[in-house]
Amino acid sequence: MCEFNVILNGKVQFKDVIYSKVEGDNVVVKNILGEGKEFKNCKIVEVDVPNTRLVLSALKP
């Protein structure tokens, strides 16, 4: 199985992510334990499967 690390501003913000969804200007993720986190005013800029990275970027104001 492929679990991702969520990267924002060059730092790991959330680990073991198996689900992600864009909801408007937010990105919602869930990990293998079912715990969730919402990243407000962000977008997905890269999905790197070999390196298990889901890279987010803040939306410009």
What do the predicted segments below correspond to?
Residues 14-15, 31, 41-42:
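A generic local structural motif
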Residues 8, 31, 58:
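Flexible glycine-/small-residue-rich
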Residues 1-26:
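N-terminal acidic leader/helix
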Residues 20-21, 28-31, 36-38:
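Structural recognition of beta-strand segments within beta-rich domains
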Residues 4, 36-61:
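C-terminal structural segments of small proteins and small subunits
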